[in-house]
Amino acid sequence: MWATLPLLCAGAWLLGVPVCGAAELCVNSLEKFHFKSWMSKHRKTYSTEEYHHRLQTFASNWRKINAHNNGNHTFKMALNQFSDMSFAEIKHKYLWSEPQNCSATKSNYLRGTGPYPPSVDWRKKGNFVSPVKNQGACGSCWTFSTTGALESAIAIATGKMLSLAEQQLVDCAQDFNNHGCQGGLPSQAFEYILYNKGIMGEDTYPYQGKDGYCKFQPGKAIGFVKDVANITIYDEEAMVEAVALYNPVSFAFEVTQDFMMYRTGIYSSTSCHKTPDKVNHAVLAVGYGEKNGIPYWIVKNSWGPQWGMNGYFLIERGKNMCGLAACASYPIPLV
């Protein structure tokens, strides 16, 4: 009997720790301590049965984080608000469940030949990037990418920073092939705002984080789109030009498991796809640069300021990493 025990479990038994089941991780006292600290920090409570399940998941994620950080990678991982969840749960709650494919989107962006500045960060140019928001357990990232890009475009054009209503896009933009909490594309959301003749502000159409019925009031619209610039598929250099010369750019990419626990550094992955049919998360490129010979994008996420680098991340630039150059666009505001 004892010979069949996994080595880790056998060690735990010898130390007097309860022996775990064959299908379970043997969670050690250090992992339990970190889990309880994490629960306190994130104000989590569970039933007895769920506690055991979440502890197992947390310990598995904890070990993946440590293994990654002990390896040779360009980014670090850390515990965050997702650390008690499996990637299957995260995909269901936070990423697109309705497949999106922007390959049919007609490009209309005409780019020049450069040269462009070696680095750009719209956050440092002035009040041109709105604060990081939190989409919650709804696959509405596309709405935050959309509002973030339009908020920046309006601020660049007028000097006035607005906070636009993601919930309006969740509730009202279905006719433009968007699906609320199940997914959508910024390019299609920009088209909705253009033809709908506006988007309301966050204060008059507050975010709920769930699908609802459309409550748009045209007289309260404060953000308007004159045109949409759709960047040619896979033309990452055109994205550089657009960010350098005009505006932060919305894009979509494929999130895989290691991205969820991102903390700092330049993210890259060998497990993601690079095609438009696999993208599952939309974000906003607010700048770019290079570090230690690795070019990167500076990207605003919508998982709150406690995730990543105060709500931002860096991702390797120039390789269409995880399909990031497949679905890029930005709005031209009507001001």
UniProtKB/Swiss-Prot annotation:
The keyword Protease applies. Belongs to the peptidase C1 family. This is Pro-cathepsin H. Glycans are attached at residues 101, 230. It holds the Pfam family Inhibitor_I29. Residues 1-22 form the signal peptide. Keywords: Disulfide bond, Glycoprotein, Hydrolase, Lysosome, Protease, Signal, Thiol protease, Zymogen. The keyword Protease applies. Composed of a mini chain and a large chain. The large chain may be split into heavy and light chain. All chains are held together by disulfide bonds. Disulfide bonds join 102-327, 138-181, 172-214, 272-322. It is found in: Lysosome. GO terms for biological process: adaptive immune response; antigen processing and presentation; bradykinin catabolic process; cellular response to thyroid hormone stimulus; dichotomous subdivision of terminal units involved in lung branching; ERK1 and ERK2 cascade; immune response; immune response-regulating signaling pathway. Its EC number is 3.4.22.16. The active site is at residues 141, 281, 301. Residues 23-97, 106-115 form a propeptide. SUPFAM superfamilies: Cysteine proteinases. It catalyses: Hydrolysis of proteins, acting as an aminopeptidase (notably, cleaving Arg-|-Xaa bonds) as well as an endopeptidase. Important for the overall degradation of proteins in lysosomes. GO terms for cellular component: acrosomal vesicle; alveolar lamellar body; axoneme; collagen-containing extracellular matrix; cytoplasmic ribonucleoprotein granule; cytosol; extracellular exosome; extracellular region.
